Amino acid sequence: MGLCLAKRNHDADDDEPHIELAGGNVHLITTKERWDQKLSEASRDGKIVLANFSARWCGPCKQIAPYYIELSENYPSLMFLVIDVDELSDFSASWEIKATPTFFFLRDGQQVDKLVGANKPELHKKITAILDSLPPSDK
């Protein structure tokens, strides 16, 4: 498992595209309004949200991104979001992000689980456990 400790300053060469963090059915969150919109949409549709607080400069974030995208395609009943902690630093701080990647599982906007670090088996295990806890009509 890997993780990066959160940092407040980023270097000028951090201006890489978001391509490595989002894709597939992963929604890139760039504003608080977009976050609110996606959480509303998920609540309306009865979906669990998996929010990945990530950073472009974080090696483990880059390593798990393709797997996260793959999960988004394999589990369409979940809503997958990615938030760049540098772009939305105040918002990320409100979630007390200490390391990246940090994954939050939310139902109706409330946290139901959390995972810190790029641990593929544990991420998959948590997704499976959450899906198994849902009534059959919500899966």
Swiss-Prot record:
Originating species: Populus jackii (Balm of Gilead)
Predominant subcellular localization, coarse grouping: cytoplasm
Site (Contributes to redox potential value): G59, P60
Disulfide bonds: C58-C61
Family per record: Belongs to the thioredoxin family. Plant H-type subfamily.
UniProt name for this protein: Thioredoxin H-type
Record keywords: Cytoplasm, Disulfide bond, Electron transport, Redox-active center, Transport
Primary role: Participates in various redox reactions through the reversible oxidation of the active center dithiol to a disulfide. The H form is known to activate a number of cytosolic enzymes.
Superkingdom of the source species: Eukaryota
Ranges of residues in domain Thioredoxin: 20-132
Coiled coil segments of this chain: none
Active site: C58, C61
The UniProt record lists the keyword Aminoacyl-tRNA synthetase: no
Location within or outside the cell: Cytoplasm
GO cellular component, one term: cytoplasm
InterPro entries: Thioredoxin-like_sf, Thioredoxin_CS, Thioredoxin_domain, Thioredoxin_H-type-like
